[in-house]
């Protein structure tokens, strides 16, 4: 299989999803996922939209605020690739904000190409040492 990627502006569904995380609202922005989306972020293996929503909320609630920035977005139809940076600011202001790079692959659903069926991504590292 061959895929041809086109660099584009990020779609609204992607911006909405990141905004839900940044705002800590975890609402309709997650509607971009199918009910049974599989998400592999680093060591995470989450199955289903509600598991993704719940686990990301739990992770964010560990004591920081995130702000996602889109650097690049590439579209090959069934596969979308996102590269960016996330500012991770600790709730305890004595800690420093880190800015890890992130890369995400979004595989779209065969039956509804407006929905993500698989999400594979990596963020970080957030520190060395």
Show the residue positions of the predicted features.
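A beta-strand edge to alpha-helix "cap/lid" segment located at domain peripheries
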Residues: 2, 54-129
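A general secondary-structure boundary signal
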Residues: 26-36, 108, 119-121
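C-terminal ligand-sensing/allosteric alpha-helical core of TetR-family HTH transcriptional regulators
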Residues: 13, 52-55
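An acidic, carboxylate-rich microenvironment
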Residues: 28, 50-51
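Short, low-complexity N-terminal intrinsically disordered segments enriched in polar/charged residues
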Residues: 1-27, 31-32
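A short gly/proline-enriched turn/hairpin at secondary-structure junctions
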Residues: 32, 36-47, 59-62
């Amino acid at each position: 299989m061959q895929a041809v990627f086109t660099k584009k502006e990020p779609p609204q569904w992607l911006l909405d999803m990141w905004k839900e995380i940044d705002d800590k609202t975890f609402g309709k922005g997650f509607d971009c996922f199918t009910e049974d989306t599989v998400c592999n972020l680093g060591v995470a293996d989450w199955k289903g939209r509600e598991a993704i929503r719940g686990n990301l909320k739990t992770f964010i609630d560990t004591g920081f605020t995130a702000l996602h920035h889109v650097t690049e977005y590439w579209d090959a139809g069934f596969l979308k690739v996102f590269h960016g940076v996330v500012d991770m600011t600790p709730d305890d202001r004595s800690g420093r904000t880190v800015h890890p790079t992130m890369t995400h692959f979004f595989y779209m659903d065969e039956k509804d190409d407006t929905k993500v069926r698989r999400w594979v991504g990596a963020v970080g590292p957030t520190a060395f040492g």
